[in-house]
UniProtKB/Swiss-Prot annotation:
Protein name: Aspartyl/glutamyl-tRNA(Asn/Gln) amidotransferase subunit C
Gene3D superfamilies in the cross-refs: Glu-tRNAGln amidotransferase C subunit, N-terminal domain (1.10.20.60)
Organism for this UniProt entry: Thermoanaerobacter pseudethanolicus (strain ATCC 33223 / 39E) (Clostridium thermohydrosulfuricum)
Pfam families given in the database record: GatC
Oligomer status and interactors: Heterotrimer of A, B and C subunits.
Gene from which the chain derives: gatC
EC number: 6.3.5.-
Biological function: Allows the formation of correctly charged Asn-tRNA(Asn) or Gln-tRNA(Gln) through the transamidation of misacylated Asp-tRNA(Asn) or Glu-tRNA(Gln) in organisms which lack either or both of asparaginyl-tRNA or glutaminyl-tRNA synthetases. The reaction takes place in the presence of glutamine and ATP through an activated phospho-Asp-tRNA(Asn) or phospho-Glu-tRNA(Gln).
Domain of life of the native organism: Bacteria
GO biological process, one term: glutaminyl-tRNAGln biosynthesis via transamidation
Family of this protein: Belongs to the GatC family.
Length: 95
């Protein structure tokens, strides 16, 4: 399936890209080759292939959330240049 020059120009316009005439010609050839290559997938027999979302059948591997002891607050704030009421104090960025 060949991609036309006008299709490349249309996609470039949608993407707000400006190409020279030489670049449009080059992309027309390249995109046609890519589409032809991808169309080869239609030749595959997938009749007995089960649809998958992942190659490996892995499910949620996250650990359970558990509250664990943390570092001492004073130790954490020891090197903070600015602190207030046991918290880091940072410059205001939103009015």
């Amino acid at each position: 399936m060949a991609i036309s020059r006008s299709e490349v120009e249309h996609v470039a316009k949608l993407a707000r890209l400006k190409f020279s005439q030489e670049e449009i010609e080059e992309f027309t050839v390249q995109l046609s080759k890519i589409i032809d290559y991808v169309n080869k997938l239609n030749e595959l027999d997938t009749e007995n292939v089960e649809p998958t979302a992942h190659i490996v059948p892995i499910h949620n591997v996250f650990r359970e959330d558990e509250v664990k002891p943390s570092m001492d607050r004073d130790k954490i704030l020891m090197n903070a240049p600015y602190k207030e009421n046991g918290c880091f104090k940072v410059p205001k960025i939103i009015e």
